């Protein structure tokens, strides 16, 4: 079964490049949803229930950190990744507080992004797959 992945990025070109990269390397593993801002991200999250979410930190509507906090209220296992141009320690600390799986800085290398998403998919899949009963 394919993993549902939500990308929330307010910059159109950045979002399109990000989605194109994900489709190129992981297209057979993912179903991709795109949000232009934090509010749209929350609407898509509620409707589609993606297993992995990539959030920009600074977006209109709600920031990526606010979106992550709201996601955590209903889904403790969603794989959250931050992709941001802000190299601020305070943001990184807040990302840790919402149990983000990764915090990538722009500009990113394609392989760095792909590895982070693959790792998130693995972690989320392991959490959601019931363990077999002990013998």
Model segments located where?
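Alpha-helical/coil-rich non-catalytic "connector" segments in signaling and regulatory proteins
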Residues: 1-134
């Amino acid at each position: 079964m394919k993993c549902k992945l939500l990308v929330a990025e307010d910059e159109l070109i950045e979002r399109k490049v990000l989605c194109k990269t994900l489709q190129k390397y992981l297209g057979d593993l993912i179903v991709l949803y795109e949000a232009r801002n934090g509010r749209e991200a929350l609407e898509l999250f509620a409707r589609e229930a993606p297993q992995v979410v990539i959030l920009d930190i600074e977006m209109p509507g709600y920031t990526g950190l606010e979106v992550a906090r709201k996601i955590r209220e209903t889904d403790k296992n969603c794989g959250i990744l931050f992709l941001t141009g802000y190299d601020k320690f305070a943001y990184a600390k807040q990302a840790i507080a919402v149990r983000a799986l990764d915090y990538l800085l722009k500009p990113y290398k394609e392989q760095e992004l792909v590895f982070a998403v693959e790792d998130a998919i693995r972690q989320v899949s392991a959490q959601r797959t019931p363990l077999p009963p002990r013998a």
